[in-house]
Structure formats: structure tokens, C-alpha cells
Amino acid sequence: MINVSFLGLMSGISVLLKTTVIVVGIFEGSNHLEDNGALEGYNDKIMEIVNGYQSFDGKFAEVLPIIGLEKDFPVVVVIGLGKSEDFDENKALKVGGVIYSELNRMKIPDASIVINTDSNVSANIGYGALLRSFKFDKYFVEKKDKNSVYLNKLVLFSKSEPQEVTALFNDLKAEGESIFLARSFVSEPPNILYPETYAQMIYEELSKVGVTVEVFDEDYMKANQMMALLGVGQGSAKKSRLVVMKWNGGDESESPIAFVGKGVTFDTGGISLKPSKGMWDMKYDMAGSASVVGIMRTLAARKAKVNAVGVVGLVENSVDGNAQRPSDVVISMSGQTIEVLNTDAEGRLVLADALWYTQEMFTPKLMVDLATLTGAVVVALGNNQYAGLFSNDDAIANQLIVAGNESGEKLWRLPLDEAYDKLIDSSIADMQNISTKGYGADSITAAQFLQRFVNGVPWVHLDIAGMAWDYEGTEICPKGATGFGVRLLNRFVSKYYESH
């Protein structure tokens, strides 16, 4: 993780000259740098060079390196900030990520950033660089050049007091460290991360920051009649686990907010076997659980004044002679029976018991579940654009949508309606786990299924199948696991539910 620190702009050019590279911003169409006088004496010369490049006009994320401004003067990298009226927290985050990527590509060890912004924007520039610096490279025997980390230190010069910016950044850093943990968990191969080992990893990592963690085995789940969850894992040599995480930062009388995550550490599809092509991606079918771990760690690390509980069901959906069969009927913890017609629609079975368990044990004020639940949501909303949101509560749904827009982790609401219920009615059980009546609406019927295991509690289901993994990378996330949901939920909690 890159080291990020902050100084005041009045520190001046003498401090800047000690760095390898100076990064300075410019708004689109502007005739001056956003340096607030820190580069006094050099501004005109830099602008003369900038104006000489017709291809550079300060559009968002454009980069122009200037070498040899003067003898022994640092390399200057000018970065476009786009239109000034559009430059906000999310744009700042992306600028920080672009700066990190460009400087690391140039093999620069350290740099200073001079952008005339307020404390919140400055902190987010640093945070964007931090988020983009994630590397999952533990299994390389020799680091290839493209996987090497060169940029280790960034100093941001802000017009705000350094202490103020640092305090804001430290809260963001706590969130970022949790996102890194979530990304790392999702990136782990399934021979390393499976229910037993994953549960132990969660215990070790979250105990460090003050989260109370309990790990429950299959005997405990059998005693609680969690047969929908256990049925998914019965074809695997890996034993299923239920992990409960608790953070009590609010008033003792306050009911907790609950986060529930699907943790299928590898999904073969079971007897309803997936095609071999692309099955390697199914290690990320536990991304919802990783996001729950991430938000619980974030709340504890920044000492959030809220009570929260996280519950994740951990299973491996594999195939052996004892594997669940299409047409099996299981009894869920709620007492409702489920005809399992497709063993590859397993995530909803895990969540059915996890949701019911959470309500019964903790009486939460609201529940949010996260799951890579359906491929259909990717068909509807695409990759890395929006997660699907389903809810029985308009107010909480709207709060999450606002938090998504503010954090950049956007949500699109899809319908729940009793008209879809008939699609999952079974002829021999209370319900079936897929629709066999026509085609389409698979994400909706999955959410409609989950709603049958919500007993009067305000609830939101987030289908993050299109958001958990990025095949190309973004300004703030390299190719691979995204840690989607941690920033969204942290904003949601801090904006609407935390005591300030």
C-alpha cells in the first residue's frame, strides 16, 4: 500500500524540489495551473509548454509529462481535471488513481501533487491513489515488470490545514484497507480459501480491529435446521461454516444494522454443472461475503458510532456421490420447504437460511444482503455499471441509491411484485428455487425467493454479480476483484445511521 501524506501549499517550492516528480492539475480550457502559487516563478514557463501541445487541453485524466524544465528541476506531470464545475469527490478519487497508474508506469519512486482544492477533495485524491495501488501478487515467484510496484510515496500539497486533510484521509484509509482485504479474499484461489480457512481468516483479520467474531460449524447449523444452506455444501469435502461478526459502537439500546453475505467459495454449479469455459471465475462467488467482512472491518477501524452485525454463510458447491440432486426437497430454518430444481441456483439457498438466522438472533432494524446471485442482472445492467437493488422498503432503498451515487458505487432498483410469486410456486413444496414457467426475470424471481425469508424486517437485496470483478480495471481498481459494496455501505451507514 502506497504511503500518502499531506503538507500545506505554503510549504513552497523548496520542499517540492526535493521530490522526483511534481504533479500539478489544470482545468479544461484554463490558462493557469491549480497550484495556488506553490510553483511561483515556474507557472508561466510550464503553461507555455502546455499551450504548445494542441492535443492537450486539460480534459479529464489527460496526462502531459514535462521533462527538463530547468537543470535539476523535478519532472513535471500536468494532469487534466476536466471542467471545473464537474470536479467533485468522485472525480478527485479517479484523478488520484490515474496519477498513481501513470507514475508507477513511469517507474517513479516518489512524487508530490499540487492541486488547489479543499480538504475533502485533497483527501480523495490521495485515497484514489491508494485504492489504485492494490496488488495481489503473492503467488508470483518472480515479479514480472508489469506487476512491479515502483511508486511508494506521495505527498499532497493542499490549501487546507494538513492536520484536517490527514484526519479525513485516515478515515478513508481505514475503509481502503478493508477494501484491500475484501479484494484479497476474492482473489484467493479456492484451494487456499474454502469455508474452513476463510472463516479462520475472517476471525484473525477482524479480531485485530475489535470486531467480535464467532465461527459456527455444521453441527450448529443442523441444530438450527439450516438445511437449505447445508444442502449446498453437502457434495464437497470442505465443511460449511457460518460466521457472525459484531461491532457495538452505538448505544446499547439500539438495534443493529445487519449485513448478510453469500459466501460460495467455489461454485461448480453442482450436479447442474456449469460449462468449463469461465468456471475459473467462480472463485469470486463469495464476493458478497467479502463485502460484508469489509464493511464490518471499516466500521470497527474508524470506531463508527453504530451497532452492526455481519452474517456470512460459507459453502463450496461441488460434486460427489452425496451432492444435492435436482428435485431434492430441503427444509429451511424458517420451516418452509424448497424444491431444488437447479443446484446452480445455490446462492439463494445459502441466503435463505442466513437471512432467517440474522432476524431470529439479532432483531435488526434493517438488513442488507449482498450476493453475486444471478447472471441475469449482468444481462440487464452490464458489467461494472450498476448493481441491482431490490427492497421491501422505499425509504431505505432510496437512501442506498443516494449513497451509491455519492460513493460512485451505483445501484439500479428493480421490481419486487407478488405477480412474480407464481413463477416460483412448486407443485410439491412451499416453493422451488428457480422459475420453470417461461423465460426471463431471473434476477427478480431470485429476489422474490429471498423475500419469502424476510419476516417483517426492512430489507434490501443487492445483486452484485456484475460488480464484483472487473476484467479491464478502472481508474481506482486494477483488473480483478473490486471490493464493491464497502464504500457504498460505509457511506450509507455514516450518512443515515451513525450518531455524530
Swiss-Prot record:
Family according to the record: Belongs to the peptidase M17 family.
Role this protein plays: Presumably involved in the processing and regular turnover of intracellular proteins. Catalyzes the removal of unsubstituted N-terminal amino acids from various peptides.
The UniProt annotation places Mn(2+) 1 binding at D267, D344, E346
Q: Which GO terms describe its biological process?
A: proteolysis
Record's Pfam families?
Peptidase_M17, Peptidase_M17_N
- The active site of this protein is located at K274, R348
Q: What is this protein called?
A: Probable cytosol aminopeptidase
Molecular function GO labels = manganese ion binding; metalloaminopeptidase activity
Read off the HAMAP family from this record: Cytosol_peptidase_M17 (MF_00181)
Q: What cofactors does the UniProt entry give for this protein?
A: Mn(2+)
Record-linked InterPro entries: Leucine_aapep/pepB (IPR011356), Macro_dom-like (IPR043472), Peptidase_M17_C (IPR000819), Peptidase_M17_leu_NH2_pept (IPR023042), Peptidase_M17_N (IPR008283)
Q: What class of enzyme is it?
A: hydrolase
Q: What is the lineage of its organism?
A: Bacteria, Pseudomonadati, Pseudomonadota, Alphaproteobacteria, Rickettsiales
Substrates-to-products reaction catalysed? Release of an N-terminal amino acid, Xaa-|-Yaa-, in which Xaa is preferably Leu, but may be other amino acids including Pro although not Arg or Lys, and Yaa may be Pro. Amino acid amides and methyl esters are also readily hydrolyzed, but rates on arylamides are exceedingly low; Release of an N-terminal amino acid, preferentially leucine, but not glutamic or aspartic acids
Q: EC number(s)? A: 3.4.11.1, 3.4.11.10
